[in-house]
């Protein structure tokens, strides 16, 4: 069972993931860029961490290293990417594997193959 999950997404996608994680008994962690500091997903999570640099909100959600850093710092048991952003990117799945953090999604090799069309 997971105790704490980083949701690497925003908006309604993140809010629905928080709801599911909470129903399973897990604490939730939001990541957000400066521009999303008043967003609902940040306020609905049990914990939230600012990522990225001001002026580049989308880039923040694509920074797999920063997201993994947050997971390590907050002691998360897993990272869930939602969809879009890093959900189909093998870099996040690979970084999770390298840090021993479960990635809730396909493994990096599968994502790499799926993206090589």
Report residues per predicted region.
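N-terminal beta-alpha lobe that positions the nucleotide/phosphoryl donor
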Residues: 1-117
């Amino acid at each position: 069972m997971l105790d704490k999950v980083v949701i690497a997404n925003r908006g309604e996608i993140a809010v629905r993931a928080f709801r599911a994680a909470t129903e399973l008994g897990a604490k939730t962690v939001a990541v957000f860029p400066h521009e999303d500091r008043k967003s609902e997903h940040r306020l609905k999570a049990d914990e939230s961490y600012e990522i990225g640099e001001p002026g580049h909100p989308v880039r923040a959600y694509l920074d797999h290293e920063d997201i993994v850093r947050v997971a390590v710092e907050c002691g998360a048991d897993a990272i869930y990417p939602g969809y879009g952003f890093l959900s189909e990117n093998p870099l996040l799945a690979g970084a999770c594997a390298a840090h021993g953090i479960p990635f809730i999604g396909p493994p990096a090799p599968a994502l790499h193959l799926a993206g090589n069309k």
